[in-house]
Amino acid sequence: MARSIKKGPFVDTHLQAKVQAEGPSSKKVIKTWSRRSTITPDFIGLTFAVHNGRKFIPVFVTENMVGHKMGEFAPTRTFFGHAADKKSKLKKK
């Protein structure tokens, strides 16, 4: 179920304070563990280092990202592909 419009988007207060302190066109990377925060128009043009559980992934915010969550752009799992079928390889030889 989607979040109610009357509540507005969720942004951690400490993250919002960091964004307002930096200014609109800052080159400094803002480190955050807040994957749950929604990207607002204030974040456009800023670079965030979003934690994925192991390391910080740099995320440059563009207009298309507004309304999405920070965590969507820092994947937590690495997909190595499906295991190959060993039986079919043995029959071919």
Curated annotation (Swiss-Prot):
Q: Which GO terms describe its cellular component?
A: cytoplasm; small ribosomal subunit
What the entry lists under InterPro entries is as follows: Ribosomal_uS19 (IPR002222), Ribosomal_uS19_bac-type (IPR005732), Ribosomal_uS19_SF (IPR023575)
Q: Does the keyword Glycosyltransferase apply?
A: no
Question: Which residues pair up as cystines?
Answer: none
Q: Which UniProt keywords apply?
A: Ribonucleoprotein, Ribosomal protein, RNA-binding, rRNA-binding
* Residues in coiled coil: none
Please identify the protein, giving its name as recorded: Small ribosomal subunit protein uS19
| Classification via SUPFAM superfamilies | Ribosomal protein S19 (SSF54570)
The protein's GO terms of the molecular function aspect are: rRNA binding; structural constituent of ribosome
